[in-house]
Amino acid sequence: RIIENFMTEIKRKGSRSTKDIPKDILEQLNSGQIETANLIEWLAVDQKLLLENLLKQTDRIKYLSPILSNIENLKKQTVNTINEVIGTEILNQVTKNNDFDFLEIISKHKSDLIRCWATYTIGKNPKLNVKEMLEKIQAFSADKHFGVREICWLAVRPTIAKNLIKSLEILSKWTNKEDENIRRFASEATRPRGVWCEHIEELKLKPELGLIILNPLKSDKSKYVQDSVGNWLNDASKTQPEFVNSLCEKWKAESPTKETAYIIKKAMRTIDKERK
């Protein structure tokens, strides 16, 4: 699914394996001149080199050493953990140096990975309350690059989980936004189990809390949104199958559309599998 999303939305065709990435393309990726075209390229970018190039280009090379030290201290270095550490330490450096202009630079950068770092400068900012944090992350939820959209909900999910009721209330208003990416964020960021992230235990036990987001999206025209809503309910079905079964029956009666039928099929896949 991730690869498909990357492949369909970036015009330049990406390589099918790391070894096939042309040298000049890799150099442009590592210097922040172009966006990644698919997941293969996204994983191939040397984030430490990209960071060094960014800091040289913007005359902020003094930030490099403390950020690299934090990366070296990671127990496990993955694309996501390095992403998070760089974003968090950039926030620390700009705060210490009163250099908030740098946040504007990285938020609008050509490189999708640099924009990913920017999402963590929001998600890791202790001075922001949940309302302010979600307001700031909304622009990233509408980013044209799938990678940024995926990382932005990861960056704020811990705060969403800690302020669940307030977050659900705020995100429920995103379900009527014109941009399908913003609508999808409301669902994806609150999935009970989610991907690459900690579960939200309260939603695993009480998925009905999510109805404020799910109900408005039950017949959304966007497949991107439909997939997320279906996955949300499939998550919930692993701990509260009765709730999901009952809701799907209700939606089937209330909303006999092909969009709702698609969501229901996706939502019921674990339950249906266990019935066989």
Which residues does each predicted region cover?
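Surface-facing alpha-helical segments and adjacent helix-coil boundary elements at the starts of domains
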Residues: 2-276
